[in-house]
Amino acid sequence: MAKIGRALISVSEKTGVVEFSRALAGYGVEILSTGGTAKLLREAGIAVKDVSEFTGFPEMLDGRVKTLHPKVHGGILGMRENPAHVAKMQEHGIEPIDMVVVNLYPFEATVAKEDCTMEDAIENIDIGGPTMLRSAAKNNRDVTVVVDHADYAVVLDEMKNSGGSVSRETNFRLAVKVYQHTAAYDGAISNWLGARTGEGVAPFPDTLTMQYKLAQGMRYGENPHQSGAFYVEKGSRESSISTARQIQGKELSYNNIGDTDAALECVKQFTEPACVIVKHANPCGVALGANIMEAYDKAYKTDPESAFGGIIAFNRELDESTARAIVERQFVEVIIAPKVTEAASEIVAAKKNVRLMECGFWPENPAPRFDYKRVNGGMLVQDADLELFTELKVVTKRAPTDKEMEDLLFTWRVAKFVKSNAIVYGRDNSTVGVGAGQMSRVNSARIAAIKAEHAGIPVQGAVMASDAFFPFRDGLDNAASVGVTAVIQPGGSMRDAEVIAAADEHGIAMVFTSMRHFRH
């Protein structure tokens, strides 16, 4: 085990550093420090030696050069069990540094500010910090390196139990954490600077660097013969499947996570109380109601057969009555809501395998983000599809009634989350039938009608949403044959005139959005 005799402490994020330093001093550890950290520790009554005194060389260039010195890096990198290293250290008066406690300038927080300039960004690129961290991590057999204040307690507990030493096993784990941290730090700098050109900000950097943290292992992946795991974005704060808290139930599976993400992101679109039921990443029942009990009841009745073993998402607090209705009515894999009442949690607890999730509430307007799709040997990157339409243009002789327009906008939101080719029939803010994932758009329309008939729900008087344009009039003819009265679609087909004429023939009102919502 490595006995700690001297520690260099220099941190931007100062949470817990005073208490940690005081505890180190209690073990007789000499503390070296710089700048604001040294000032803070002295004000707390802790003895500190400035790094400039330790090296015999002053800080210079407005603080850009503080720790870049052989006495610092020799003291960190010198191998204690290597006689040649020890001899050279003695020859040059280099004293060992046994612990490095450093975190880095807040580059990501700086560039996240709207008024951040290039100068601000450059000045928040840490040089000495990463260099010390990497040096200490390289020599982890002899040096303890701490980059995360969450590890202060771990280190102190080990020192308490070992008389002031830290094990090589702990040092190795902390060193790995350092390289993960510096990789993410350099990646953030690379991504931000790489998007800056002489002509402004490019939408995508030349090189994209990302880091995800292992959140959980899994019994298997999408299928039992595949291994799987779940990684989450570092520092993610948005209400999502990645930040949700599991209250009870079995461990989330690979498919559970994908389906719950689809359900939650769909239900987030609605401001009224809403319920979304998803099966295999497709909404099979979506509805709005005066409350979530009504919304759930309507959504379930759309397609009770497909709802079996599905994922249920709400945009309101899950209450006792709704929880009871779910567990008494159907088998469900996951229930997710922004908040769960204690009474609702107790009801669901009767079904111990049901995964109950609480994700927190979300802002009305989501922050822009990227979507990623892995392909063999590469990755597709795009803006997330957060917009709804470019315009609402009535293109037929008959305009939709106010009630039809309300249902059109409802089904349009649902269609965004149905796999293409997507057709959604809806009425009274509830899905009537969903046709998903067909290679032919007219077949998706036929399937939506079949689903409605199977559930005993008449399509007559319903509206229809299509995620992309109709290439031929057959989609409109099919809609008319089952009683659809209004249609919403992007438009943009070379046969738009033919499709509009078909709608007029059938007395169907049609609205173009000028925005497609393919989903693959």
From Swiss-Prot:
Pathway: Purine metabolism; IMP biosynthesis via de novo pathway; 5-formamido-1-(5-phospho-D-ribosyl)imidazole-4-carboxamide from 5-amino-1-(5-phospho-D-ribosyl)imidazole-4-carboxamide (10-formyl THF route): step 1/1; Purine metabolism; IMP biosynthesis via de novo pathway; IMP from 5-formamido-1-(5-phospho-D-ribosyl)imidazole-4-carboxamide: step 1/1. SUPFAM superfamilies: Cytidine deaminase-like, Methylglyoxal synthase-like. GO terms for molecular function: IMP cyclohydrolase activity; phosphoribosylaminoimidazolecarboxamide formyltransferase activity. Its EC number is 2.1.2.3, 3.5.4.10. Keywords: Hydrolase, Multifunctional enzyme, Purine biosynthesis, Transferase. It catalyses: (6R)-10-formyltetrahydrofolate + 5-amino-1-(5-phospho-beta-D-ribosyl)imidazole-4-carboxamide = 5-formamido-1-(5-phospho-D-ribosyl)imidazole-4-carboxamide + (6S)-5,6,7,8-tetrahydrofolate; IMP + H2O = 5-formamido-1-(5-phospho-D-ribosyl)imidazole-4-carboxamide. GO terms for biological process: 'de novo' IMP biosynthetic process. Disulfide bonds: none annotated. PROSITE patterns: MGS. SMART domains: AICARFT_IMPCHas, MGS. It comes from the Bacteria. GO terms for cellular component: cytosol. Residues 1-147 form the MGS-like domain. The keyword Hydrolase applies. The keyword Transferase applies. The IMP cyclohydrolase activity resides in the N-terminal region. Belongs to the PurH family. This is Bifunctional purine biosynthesis protein PurH. The gene is purH.
